[in-house]
From Swiss-Prot:
Protein name, UniProt field: ATP synthase subunit b 2
Role of this protein: F(1)F(0) ATP synthase produces ATP from ADP in the presence of a proton or sodium gradient. F-type ATPases consist of two structural domains, F(1) containing the extramembraneous catalytic core and F(0) containing the membrane proton channel, linked together by a central stalk and a peripheral stalk. During catalysis, ATP synthesis in the catalytic domain of F(1) is coupled via a rotary mechanism of the central stalk subunits to proton translocation. Component of the F(0) channel, it forms part of the peripheral stalk, linking F(1) to F(0).
Lineage: Bacteria, Pseudomonadati, Pseudomonadota, Alphaproteobacteria, Hyphomicrobiales
Similarity field: Belongs to the ATPase B chain family.
Gene name of the encoded protein: atpF2
Membrane-topology annotation of the record: Single-pass membrane protein
Coiled-coil intervals, chain numbering: none
Keywords per UniProt: ATP synthesis, Cell inner membrane, Cell membrane, CF(0), Hydrogen ion transport, Ion transport, Membrane, Transmembrane, Transmembrane helix, Transport
Amino acid sequence: MTDTFWAFVGLVLFLALLAYFKVPEMIVHRLDARAKRIKDELDEALRLREEAQEVLAEYQRKHAEAEKDAQEIIAAAKREVEAVVSEARTKAEEYVKNRNKLAEQKIAQAEADAIRVVSSSAVDLAVSAARVLIEQELDSNKANELIKESLFEESLTKMKAYLN
């Protein structure tokens, strides 16, 4: 019996002792438990990855919606600004038009007043000239008589009113 034989016997006894205490089953059990734990962690990681992808997709969808809403709001604001500017321009043009019309009316009124004043002055001048000529042409008795009867004054007043 050599040393190798005794080493072999020792090895067989050691392996038998390990089998008796169920060490290989414990090792297999621990390895299975560890493999299960690793598999569970991988499954959890996959689930978290899928969840993260869903969250990312949801975020991207919401971001796209927000971008679209922002573009719609900007477009609506631009349309509203254009409408306000157009309305302001229309009101300004209308205001200028009304002011021009009012100025033209004032000018026409001033022209009419000037014509009336000139016409009235011309009538007064004509009446005065007529009075002077009539007084010069008539003798003083007849002139006094006409003035006393007020026919002359009344006819001059009527003529003045008619010419004005």
